[in-house]
Curated annotation (Swiss-Prot):
Residues 1-34 form a transit peptide. The chain crosses the membrane at residues 52-72. Its main location: mitochondrion. Keywords: Calcium, Calcium transport, Ion transport, Membrane, Mitochondrion, Mitochondrion inner membrane, Transit peptide, Transmembrane, Transmembrane helix, Transport. It is a single-pass membrane protein. Belongs to the SMDT1/EMRE family. PANTHER family: ESSENTIAL MCU REGULATOR, MITOCHONDRIAL. This is Essential MCU regulator, mitochondrial. It holds the Pfam family DDDD. One of its GO terms (cellular component) is uniplex complex. It comes from Drosophila pseudoobscura pseudoobscura. The keyword Ion transport applies. The keyword Manganese does not apply. GO terms for biological process: calcium import into the mitochondrion; mitochondrial calcium ion homeostasis; mitochondrial calcium ion transmembrane transport.
């Protein structure tokens, strides 16, 4: 019974796939997908230039983000504790 219910949707999906594969505009899209890697002749393009300070740029983005995130979380924890919304109990620290 379940198989008979799935027959029509599966046949419809196969038909849509055949129509999409037969459409010439879809093959153009697939060819353009790799146009950044290959020339029209089929030769590989040269490797792009790398930034000499790429690792430095990553550190300049990550380190301030960590400090800003730590500051925000510290401020939120202080706010929650001051307003008695969340107060950690001392009993939890003694469990070993």
């Amino acid at each position: 019974m379940i198989v008979s219910r799935l027959t029509f949707p599966l046949q419809a999906a196969k038909l849509v796939a055949r129509k999409a594969a037969g459409n010439p505009s879809n093959s153009i899209i697939q060819r353009r997908h790799m146009s950044g890697v290959y020339f029209r002749s089929g030769a590989l393009r040269p490797k792009p230039d790398e930034m000499p300070f790429g690792l430095f740029a990553i550190f300049c983005a990550v380190i301030p983000g960590l400090f800003i995130g730590a500051t925000i979380s510290k401020n939120v924890a202080n706010f929650l504790e001051e307003n008695d919304l969340f107060v950690p109990s001392d009993d939890d620290d003694d469990e070993d």
